Every structure is written in structure tokens, then in C-alpha cells.
């Protein structure tokens, strides 16, 4: 269905392309005018464009002249002139589409066109890359063009201090990674002072390698978390309990859908091992979650595939790039479960402080566009989720690459033997070879065989990635053999004969000179030598057939296969690609189905030798069918993540909007009467609902004492009318507030009200996020009861959010009414505010903020530092009241909707507070 839909939706693409070509003709007509300008005249164009925009001209009106200006500025600064097809790509970006451009077509240069044009509005342009290296490289390289034209450029980097980020965002164009932009948005909605916010809106984003960021990363939400419960022992117990379970008897697993669950037999075994009567009787859902994560860790996540263990630490491997994702941890306890399985230190579980999916983050932009070499296969998803179509941009030169038919072997061993033979033969002929693998295991396996045969080669995987860009840049040298997991080195062109700039640095190092310390004369001499070597090798490599890309396995996504193919044949260069498959490959085994089993049986029946491959259209179709199945499953999973986050996204927008209003000076004093009336009305109805003889006046009085800290309450009897009772309670609360205001002074009270409300919002929101995490973990079980889990989730999330809002205002009143000012709150610095936060979900994370202490303490100094009459601060789980040291009642300070202090996981009103 997605492919069919994509074809229908793409019918207008050719029409758009024709329109873009007409605009290119206008740009080309302006080129002589731009060439005739002096540098000063060309630079003055920017201010003229800004003035015209301010007077009412649209960016579309300015486009031809602006693009012609950038093209000429590029020639004068970095010596590169935009091709016509690059101008088309720039127009596509400006129009809010995804430009699919083949590898080597100069996507980085294309971004300068749309970036410059949209920066003229003054609202800021975000250029998003997949890693810090590319963000820094592109900001410096393309920044030369921007700065020549008077456009400021900002750069976000992993570990950058927050004080340096504000200037970066205030620049006309800001470069950074997707996770850095996303985390900054979340952090902006956790700060306690308006000047600590760094972002200034979401006007326009250009996403480089857009498929990697908006598709591959979309299943993983961005999460800022703090330290939560300590349950390392529980993880270890469950890891032992699930070890040794028998597939299909003790548990059922669907690798295609990434699901696993115990059978009744298996559940009984686990419960016996743990000495637990009924895991599913745990109302908190935590034991069920421990079981689920232990099963996943033991049977679905494998060392050196999804993760590696380095120096006693479990590190995630990006399944699409093969890179280690430093600083990132699986959520919902899965990472701890893997640590327990691998018998390394189990780090304490984190509590979510703020979270958002990449889908919902990028949907906030007024205009979104992107660039990649492979997007058309995901056109339907881009349209459905992001409302952004894909525009295929024709290549500047025809593609000369030869894509050979797949070779399919019966066994994995036979396949790898054939791969090595092919590599050896091409290496001897001087043809460079790039071998793509899907796992670290496979890359190391091929490396071992090549080493035994004396073939020099480079390995790029999650374990060896320090000089990734340099190694991949030289993968086109004569006879070079490079083994890379998937798309390691993406974003770096492979030039036939080698990259002279990288080679020049190597020449200097071989002479004992650090490139940064070399004189200009030394640099020029090294570059001259490198250019001569590269030119000679380029001729030899071209004669040998160009770069050969060998794929050792089809990826689950055709797009990833196309990315691997795209490393060869750039800019009209010759090249070849060849995929080697086996019937034992994961893709074939998991998704091939009965027909693939039939092919295997046929090969066995005719006793075909292991080293004899088959080439048959039926096998190719089966492979494509298997990939199509996986793509549908993965799309459904990403859509599922979005469906669930959409529920919370609306709630997040409400909470963050309220926070920002307070930060921007919203006067809470004006709301006190409304908040008081709505809170007292709700509570009076809760305690005194129905007939008077069923009223819980004692409970109401306890609540009122807890709320205000006073014992001289109005007198209530069963003879009092409900309306009068509600009026008396409201008046009493309002009077208490007025007295507090008079005592502290109105200005002090106004400031404290804002700070207290921020703290209450943050505390309640964190608790709510944790509750939603547990709800999502167990909601899938509702499907067994013939109920739609998503509908159930929406219903319960709505009820929980309603309760959140109600208790939020109640907590605010409770804190403000009982608060005693002892000194002015100490203003917390940005370092204190986020030093305890932990970041997960993106490949690049904030490196100087790894400490895992008490996460909620980041809010402590930001809130009003006050004391109750007993001299203590607010509790962590809620902003509650406080028990006197001589009070024998241990529950006097516990709110009815707070977690019960006994540790059961239930709310207090459903546990020890049931009869109170």
C-alpha cells in the first residue's frame, strides 16, 4: 500500500521539476550581472534583500536573485559553482520538500541556497546533521559563504556549555545534530528563569541525511532523565530466572515484530525461581516490566550486534550505521536488564524528566525540508507523518555504475568464502573494494579471513571508529580494501584515487609534522605530492572498473542497500556493486516464508555444492518481498510510537505553554481566586457527595488542615447545606492566602507564587511521565481482552492528565499556604540546573552532563526555598505537607493521590490511606 500510495502522490513531481527548471533559467540569466559586481556590491545584496522582504516581498519573489548571489559568493569564497541540478535541489528545499540527490552530487553546497534565502526573514534557520563532525565541518566550510554575505552562523556541539548555545541560536543559521536541537527544546522547558532558554522558535529546518534522522532514529524518543529507583538486585534476579527457558515451550518470540512473552509453563518457572506467587498481581506493573525486559535482553538482544561491552560498560550500537551511540541508554529498564545479563555493574534506573519523539519535535517547525541520497522508498511515510513530499533531483552526470545481480548461496560459510575470493581477486587487480556488513561480528569475521590471506585492509565498525572519516575518504585508493558496518562514514565522499587533502595530512604526519603546526610551505608541498599520487592512482582505479561495493547481506530496508550501492559511481565515475546472500541470513530466515524454505529444499534436493551460487528471479523477488515485509513492520512500529506520543504531545504542549507563560511573567496572583474555588469545589464534592449522612466531614477537615497548616477551621455539621459548606471552605482558604500575602508582602508573594508553581508543574509532570511509562509497558496486554490498547491508553492518559491538572493546583495551594520565607532563594546557575541530567535517544548527547545523581534535585534550588512550620522542604514525590517531629502518625504528610510511603507502588488512597 505505501508504494502504491507513493506512486499516486508522486504524479505531480515531474510538473514541479519543470517549474523549478524555469526558475533556474531566471537564475542563470542573472549570473553575468552578479559576476560583474565587486565584492562590496555582492555583499550589499543581503541588506537589500532584507529591506525588500520587510517591505512585503515574499521569499519566492527574492529567490532567483538570492540564489544567483549565493552561487557567485560560493565561486569567490570556496571556488565551487552550483550546478543547475543543485539550484533545483535548493528550490526543492525552499519549497518544503525532501530533495533526493545521489551520492557525490553536492548536497552540502545545495543547503546554502535555501539556508541563505530563508535566513533573510530573520527568524533563524536550523541545519540538522547526523553527528558533530559533520555539523562542525559544514558550519566552517559553508560558513565561509554565509559570512561573506553578512549572514551569521552558529554551531551546537556535544558538551557545549549552555551559555554558549544562546548566541548559536541567535545566529541567522545554526548547525547542530538532531539530538542537540531536541534536547535543547526539552531543557528550555525545564529552566526556572526566562533568560536560561536558548532556542528562539522553530521556523525552518533543513535536515541532512533526512532518512537517517526522520526514519531510522524515529523509533527512539529523546529522553532527559534523572536518577530514580535503585533495583539492581531485582534486575539480576530476573536475569537468572529467565536464563535457560526453552523457546516455543517456555516463551514465544516473534523476531519480525520484535515481541516476546512467556507461556503459562514459562511463567510458572520464572515465578518459582523468584519465589513470587503471581507476577501479574503487582498493581504497579514494575514486576511485569522487569520480566519483559529480562526476556528481551536474554533472547532478542545479542552482544556485538545490538550492543557491545567495553570496559565493563554496555554500549548501544546503531543498527543502521554500526557506530557506538555514546551516552545513550535503552529506556524502560532494558539497558539495566542487559547489564544484569552480561554480569556487569547495573546502573541505577533513571526517571524520565522530559521526553519527546523526533517526529513530534520536527513537526513543530513551520517549514521542514531535507536532503538524502535515498528517500523515495519512504515517500509515503514522509508524506503521512511529516507532510513533506520527496522530489527526485536528476544527477549532474549520468550514473555509470554497474549493479550486478545478487549471488545467493545455501550457507553463510559458503557466502563469506565467496566474498573473500572476490575481494582477493579485485585487490590483486588494483580495484578498491568497500565491503558492507550488517554487524560487528560479520565485519570481524571477514577481517580475520583477509588477515590470514595477507590482504591489508581497514575495518570500520563500532569498535574502531576514531579515524572514520579519514579511512572512508581513502577507500577509493588503488587496491584499498575497507570493511564497514552498514553506513559508517556516511557524509564523506569516496574519491577514486584517494582524497588529496586527507593524504596531504598523512604525508605530513609521516614526516613527523602535525598538520596544525605545519608551515604554509610544508602544507603546499605535501598537497602537491598528494595531488600527483591521487591523479596517478585515479587513472589506474578507473581502468580497473572504479570502486566496487560488496554487500554481504541484504539489509531489512531497501533504502540502506541503496545507500551502500550509492558509495560507488559518484559524479559519473565508473563502479560496480555486488550483493552476496545466503539462505541462512537473518532476513531470509525471519521473513522469507515458506517459498524461501522451498528454494533451500530445492538446492538440497539437487545436491548443489555449497560454493555454487544461484541466480534466479524468484529468489530476487523473494528477497524484495522479505524487505517489503520488514519495511511495513518497521513503519508500523514507528507509527505506533507516534500514535502513543501524539497523546502525550498535546498534554506536553499544555504543560510547556503554562510553564512559558509563568516564565514570561504571567501573574498567578490573579488566578488564586479561580484556583481556590475550583479546588475547593472538587474536594468538597469528593468528601461530601450525596446525602448528608454519608458525608466524610472528618476527612474534609483533615484535608483542610493539611492544605493550610491551620487547626482553627470553620465548624461543619451534617446540618450545613452543601452550598454553604463549599462557600465556607473557599472563604477559609482565600482568607489564609490573604493573610500570608499581607505577612510576606505582595511583591514577594508574586515572585514566590511563580517559583512554587514551576516546581509543582515539574514535580507532577515527572511523576506523570513515570506513570505513563508503566502504563505503556503493560497496555499491550489489553489486546488479549479484545480491547484496542491505543484506545485504552488514550482513555487512561486523559483521566491521568485530568488528575494531574487537578492535583497540580492543589499542590500549589498547599505549598504556598504553608510556606514560610527564611531567605531569598539562591539563583541557580545553568551548570547546577542540568548537572544531574542524563540524556538518551540520540546518537550525539550532551557530554559534560553525565553524572547520575538525584535527578529531581536539579529543580530544588530553582523553587522557592521555604519552610513549613516544622522547617522542612517539599517532598520529592509531591509538594506536600509535613509531619511534626513528635507526631506519631507517619502518614500525616501524605497526599491522597501520592504514592504510598510503604513502597507498594499504589496510591495512598488505595493503600494505607483507604480508611483515612
Predicted segments, located by residue:
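Conserved P-loop NTPase motor core
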Residues: 1-607, 657, 673-674, 678
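Active-site-adjacent structural elements in folded domains
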Residues: 111, 419, 884-887, 895
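Extended, charged helical/alpha-beta scaffold domains that provide interaction surfaces
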Residues: 308-315, 321-328, 548-550, 571-572, ...
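Short Cys/His-rich zinc-binding micro-motifs
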Residues: 890-909, 913
Amino acid at each position: 500500500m505505501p508504494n502504491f500510495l507513493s506512486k499516486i502522490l508522486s504524479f505531480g513531481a515531474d510538473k514541479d521539476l519543470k517549474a523549478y527548471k524555469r526558475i533556474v533559467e531566471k537564475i542563470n540569466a542573472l549570473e553575468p550581472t552578479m559576476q560583474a559586481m565587486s565584492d562590496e556590491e555582492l555583499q550589499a545584496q543581503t541588506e537589500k534583500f532584507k529591506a525588500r522582504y520587510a517591505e512585503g516581498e515574499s521569499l519566492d519573489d527574492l529567490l532567483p536573485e538570492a540564489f544567483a548571489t549565493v552561487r557567485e559568493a560560493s565561486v569567490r569564497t570556496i571556488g565551487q559553482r552550483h550546478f543547475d541540478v543543485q539550484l533545483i535541489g535548493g528550490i526543492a528545499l525552499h519549497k518544503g520538500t525532501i530533495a533526493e540527490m545521489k551520492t557525490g552530487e553536492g548536497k552540502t553546497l545545495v543547503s546554502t541556497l535555501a539556508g541563505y534565502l530563508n535566513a533573510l526573514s530573520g527568524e533563524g534557520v536550523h541545519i540538522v546533521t547526523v553527528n558533530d563532525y559533520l555539523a562542525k565541518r559544514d558550519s566552517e566550510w559553508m560558513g565561509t559563504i554565509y559570512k561573506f554575505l553578512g549572514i551569521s552562523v552558529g554551531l551546537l556541539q556535544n558538551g557545549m556549555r549552555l551559555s554558549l548555545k544562546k548566541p548559536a541560536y541567535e545566529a541567522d543559521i545554526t548547525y547542530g545534530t538532531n539530538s542537540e536541537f531536541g534536547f535543547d527544546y526539552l531543557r528550555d522547558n525545564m529552566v526556572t528563569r526566562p533568560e536560561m532558554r536558548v532556542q528562539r522558535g522553530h521556523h525552518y529546518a533543513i535536515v541532512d541525511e533526512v532518512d537517517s534522522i526522520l526514519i531510522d532514529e524515529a523509533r527512539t524518543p529523546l529522553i532527559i532523565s534523572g536518577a530514580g529507583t535503585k533495583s539492581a538486585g531485582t534486575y539480576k534476579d530476573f536475569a537468572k530466572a529467565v536464563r535457560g527457558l526453552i523457546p516455543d515451550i517456555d516463551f514465544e518470540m516473534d523476531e519480525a515484530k520484535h515481541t516476546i512473552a512467556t507461556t503459562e509453563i514459562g511463567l510458572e518457572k520464572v515465578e518459582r525461581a523468584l519465589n513470587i506467587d503471581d507476577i501479574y498481581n503487582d498493581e504497579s506493573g514494575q514486576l511485569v516490566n522487569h520480566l519483559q525486559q529480562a526476556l528481551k535482553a536474554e533472547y532478542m538482544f545479542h552482544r556485538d550486534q545490538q550492543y557491545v561491552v567495553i570496559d565493563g560498560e554496555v554500549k548501544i550500537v546503531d543498527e543502521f550505521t554500526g557506530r557506538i551511540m555514546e551516552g545513550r541508554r535503552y529506556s524502560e529498564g532494558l539497558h539495566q536488564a542487559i547489564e544484569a545479563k552480561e554480569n556487569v555493574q547495573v546502573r541505577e534506573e533513571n526517571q524520565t524528566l522530559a521526553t519527546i519523539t523526533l517526529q513530534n519535535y520536527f513537526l513543530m517547525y513551520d517549514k521542514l525540508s531535507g536532503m538524502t541520497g535515498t528517500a523515495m522508498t519512504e515517500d509515503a511515510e514522509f508524506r503521512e507523518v511529516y507532510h513533506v513530499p520527496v522530489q527526485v533531483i536528476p544527477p549532474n552526470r549520468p550514473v555509470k555504475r554497474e549493479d550486478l545481480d545478487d549471488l545467493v548461496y545455501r550457507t553463510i560459510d559458503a557466502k563469506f568464502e565467496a566474498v573473500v575470493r572476490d575481494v582477493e581477486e579485485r585487490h590483486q587487480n588494483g580495484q578498491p573494494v568497500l565491503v558492507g556488513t550488517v554487524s560487528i561480528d560479520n565485519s570481524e569475521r571477514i577481517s580475520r579471513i583477509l588477515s590470514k590471506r595477507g590482504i591489508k585492509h581497514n575495518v570500520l565498525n563500532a569498535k574502531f571508529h576514531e579515524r572514520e572519516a579519514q579511512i572512508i575518504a581513502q577507500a577509493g585508493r588503488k587496491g584499498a580494501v575497507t570493511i564497514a558496518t552498514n553506513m559508517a562514514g556516511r557524509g564523506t565522499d569516496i574519491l577514486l584515487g584517494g582524497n588529496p587533502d586527507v593524504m596531504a595530512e598523512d604525508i605530513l604526519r609521516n614526516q613527523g609534522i602535525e598538520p596544525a603546526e605545519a608551515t604554509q610551505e610544508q602544507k603546499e608541498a605535501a598537497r602537491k605530492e598528494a595531488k600527483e599520487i591521487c591523479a596517478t592512482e585515479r587513472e589506474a582505479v578507473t581502468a580497473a572498473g572504479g570502486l566496487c561495493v560488496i554487500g554481504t547481506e541484504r539489509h531489512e530496508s531497501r533504502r540502506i542497500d541503496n545507500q551502500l550501492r550509492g558509495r560507488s559511481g559518484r559524479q559519473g565515475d565508473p563502479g560496480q556493486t555486488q550483493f552476496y546472500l545466503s539462505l541462512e541470513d537473518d532476513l531470509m530466515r525471519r521473513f522469507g516464508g515458506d517459498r524461501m524454505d522451498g528454494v533451500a529444499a530445492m538446492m538440497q534436493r539437487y545436491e548443489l555444492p555449497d560454493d555454487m551460487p544461484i541466480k534466479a528471479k524468484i529468489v530476487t523477488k523473494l528477497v524484495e518481498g522479505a524487505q517489503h515485509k520488514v519495511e511495513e513492520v518497521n513503519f508500523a512500529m514507528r507509527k505506533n510510537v507516534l500514535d502513543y506520543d501524539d497523546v502525550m504531545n498535546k498534554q506536553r504542549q499544555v504543560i510547556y505553554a503554562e510553564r512559558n507563560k509563568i516564565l514570561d511573567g504571567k501573574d498567578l496572583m490573579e488566578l488564586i481566586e479561580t484556583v481556590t474555588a475550583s479546588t475547593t469545589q472538587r474536594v468538597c464534592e469528593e468528601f461530601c457527595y450525596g446525602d448528608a449522612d454519608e458525608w466524610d466531614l472528618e476527612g474534609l477537615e483533615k484535608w483542610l488542615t493539611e492544605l493550610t497548616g491551620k487547626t482553627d477551621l470553620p465548624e461543619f455539621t451534617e446540618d450545613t447545606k452543601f452550598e454553604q459548606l463549599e462557600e465556607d471552605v473557599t472563604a477559609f482558604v482565600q482568607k489564609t492566602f490573604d493573610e500570608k500575602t499581607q505577612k510576606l508582602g505582595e511583591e514577594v508573594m508574586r515572585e514566590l507564587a511563580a517559583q512554587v508553581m514551576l516546581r509543582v508543574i515539574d514535580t507532577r509532570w515527572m511523576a506523570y511521565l513515570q506513570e505513563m511509562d508503566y502504563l505503556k509497558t503493560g497496555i499491550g496486554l489489553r489486546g488479549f481482552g479484545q480491547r484496542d490498547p491505543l484506545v485504552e491508553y488514550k482513555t487512561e492518559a486523559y483521566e491521568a492528565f485530568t488528575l494531574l491538572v487537578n492535583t497540580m493546583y492543589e499542590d500549589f495551594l498547599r505549598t504556598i499556604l504553608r510556606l514560610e520565607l527564611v531567605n531569598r532563594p539562591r539563583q541557580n546557575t545553568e551548570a547546577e540546573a542540568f548537572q544531574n541530567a542524563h540524556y538518551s535517544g540520540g546518537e550525539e548527547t550532551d557530554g559534560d552532563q553525565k553524572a547520575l545523581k538525584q535527578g529531581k534535585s536539579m529543580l530544588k534550588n530553582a523553587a522557592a526555598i521555604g519552610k513549613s512550620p516544622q522547617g522542612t522542604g517539599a517532598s520529592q514525590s509531591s509538594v506536600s505537607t509535613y509531619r511534626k517531629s513528635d507526631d506519631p502518625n507517619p502518614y500525616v504528610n501524605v497526599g491522597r493521590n501520592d504514592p504510598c510511603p510503604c513502597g507498594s507502588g499504589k496510591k495512598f488512597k488505595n493503600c494505607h490511606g483507604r480508611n483515612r
